[in-house]
């Protein structure tokens, strides 16, 4: 039986997206535009570009317009391949070259981030700071010297695993939950020594706990949800979240299907997960990592066909996670605009969050984490 909420979602996604786009022309009254304009706003996992663009497509005028409209200061952009030891090193090198070319071509809008000072400069100059990050350790293979290689190329965030097992540890869909390997321990030590941020977003529960314990500095979970609200493998338990916060880390809540156990999530689900994470971790340890593009989704038949094909491709490759479905989309229909962070701020304000707390969640917490880890 289809309840009214899911019927409205399934039949009205396009309408919701259009309504949100219309509302985007004016700032939400409950959180001042001036306050947002002064905030450091960080998407802990995302990137510029249009969702329906093919890989390696140069940024369009529309994508750059959306970057400026977003109000974002910086974004952790995935440059690594995932899930393939055969291909991911070469894929990562190509991705880094592509994004370096995009940053050079649009130096008035984009800035490569290597230090915390670069984030401050991005804010001052009203550009988007691009932080190169990994979502899998597969490009490293068994060669820890590659950490330095990729560091020289600008990478600043290293996620230990994707969903499956790799040489470092188990991802969140591995039934064995084997944790961090001996090689993984050495990898963590090398990342600490070289002052790179460790990300545990896709790690299995044991991998997450062991990596937090092993790291000498705070770590990130850049994009996840709360398992207490939606018990799916991609979400983190309260115990994991508290352990992260107790070591000084920050968790980013995503705008993904996993915010609900079933059905299409909305902004209300996102707010609930943020509220829960703040309750577990404290307001100094929560942020946002959308796991999506800055530009909104053009929700039409072509998008639905492409999305269904991507879900099937991920399943065939063995990298998908429970909760990924062709009819549950990887965006929130009522936050489908480039300035979604401003609307999230307004929703949190209506829930009673102070401007100071909202500013931390928008990006100040991740900015502080970057400064702590990168500067040592």
Where are these regions (language model features)?
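Divalent metal-binding pocket/active-site signature
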Residues: 138-141, 152-235
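N-terminal hydrophobic targeting/anchoring segments and the immediately downstream early-domain regions
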Residues: 2-21, 25-176, 231-376
């Amino acid at each position: 039986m289809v309840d009214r909420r899911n019927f409205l979602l399934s039949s009205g996604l396009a309408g919701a997206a259009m309504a949100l786009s219309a509302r985007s022309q004016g700032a939400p009254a409950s959180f001042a535009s001036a306050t947002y304009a002064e905030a450091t706003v960080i998407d802990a996992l995302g990137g510029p570009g249009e969702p329906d663009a093919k890989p390696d497509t140069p940024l369009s005028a529309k994508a750059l317009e959306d970057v400026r409209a977003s109000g974002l200061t910086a974004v952790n952009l995935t440059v690594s391949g995932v899930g393939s030891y055969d291909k991911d090193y070469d894929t990562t090198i190509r991705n880094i070259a592509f994004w370096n070319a995009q940053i050079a071509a649009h130096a008035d809008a984009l800035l490569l981030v290597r230090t915390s000072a670069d984030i401050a400069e991005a804010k001052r100059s009203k550009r988007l700071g691009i932080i190169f990050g990994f979502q899998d350790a597969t490009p490293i293979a068994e060669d820890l010297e590659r950490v330095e290689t990729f560091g020289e190329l600008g990478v600043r965030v290293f996620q230990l695993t994707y969903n499956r097992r790799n040489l470092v540890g188990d991802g969140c869909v591995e039934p064995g939950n084997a944790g961090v390997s001996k090689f993984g321990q050495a990898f963590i030590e090398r990342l600490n020594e070289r002052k790179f941020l460790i990300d545990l977003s896709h790690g299995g529960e044991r991998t997450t706990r062991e990596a937090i314990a092993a790291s000498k500095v705070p770590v990130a979970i850049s994009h996840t949800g709360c398992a207490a609200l939606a018990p799916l493998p991609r979400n983190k338990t309260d115990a994991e979240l508290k352990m992260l916060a107790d070591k000084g880390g920050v968790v980013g809540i995503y705008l993904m299907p996993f915010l609900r156990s079933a059905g299409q999530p909305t902004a209300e689900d996102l707010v609930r997960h943020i509220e829960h994470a703040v309750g577990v971790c404290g307001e100094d340890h929560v942020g946002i990592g959308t796991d999506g593009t800055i530009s909104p989704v053009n929700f039409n038949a072509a998008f639905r066909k492409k999305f269904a094909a991507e879900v099937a491709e991920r399943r065939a490759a063995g990298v998908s996670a429970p909760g990924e479905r062709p009819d549950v989309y990887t965006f929130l229909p009522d936050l489908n605009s480039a300035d979604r962070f401003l609307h999230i701020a307004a929703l949190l304000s209506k829930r009673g969050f102070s401007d100071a707390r909202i500013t931390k969640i928008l990006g100040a917490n991740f900015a502080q984490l970057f400064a702590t880890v990168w500067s040592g």
